[in-house]
Amino acid sequence: MTNYLYLAIAIAAEVVATTSLKAVAGFSKPLPLLLVVGGYVLAFSMLVLVMRTLPVGVVYAIWSGLGIVLVSLVAMFVYGQRLDPAALLGIGLIIAGVLVIQLFSRASGH
């Protein structure tokens, strides 16, 4: 269970870092830059811990898939990005893929 907590922290940190990239404004704003650097350092640090016991393919699929979904949603609410039907379908397919991996994959740790 601890590994999934670390994975959740990694995903959240990556989402904060990625969505803060837009606010950096050409490196002219230091606080968003700190969020970017700190977020990525935290995200990858947590991924290192998670990958000690969980399969790399499963971890990366969950991390990247949920990261894409959450970054898209944050961009929609914070930056006013519009998601067209194709984007919403894609997000739905990503969520479905993560669920399939979580519920039905027999991948084991190394």
UniProtKB/Swiss-Prot annotation:
Its main location: membrane. It is found in: Cell membrane. Confers resistance to ethidium bromide, acriflavine and methyl viologen. This is Multidrug transporter PA4990. GO terms for molecular function: amino-acid betaine transmembrane transporter activity; antiporter activity; choline transmembrane transporter activity. The keyword Cell membrane applies. The chain crosses the membrane at residues 7-27, 31-51, 58-78, 85-105. It comes from Pseudomonas aeruginosa (strain ATCC 15692 / DSM 22644 / CIP 104116 / JCM 14847 / LMG 12228 / 1C / PRS 101 / PAO1). GO terms for biological process: choline transport; glycine betaine transport; transmembrane transport. Belongs to the drug/metabolite transporter (DMT) superfamily. Small multidrug resistance (SMR) (TC 2.A.7.1) family. GO terms for cellular component: plasma membrane. Disulfide bonds: none annotated. Keywords: Antiport, Cell membrane, Membrane, Transmembrane, Transmembrane helix, Transport. It is a multi-pass membrane protein.
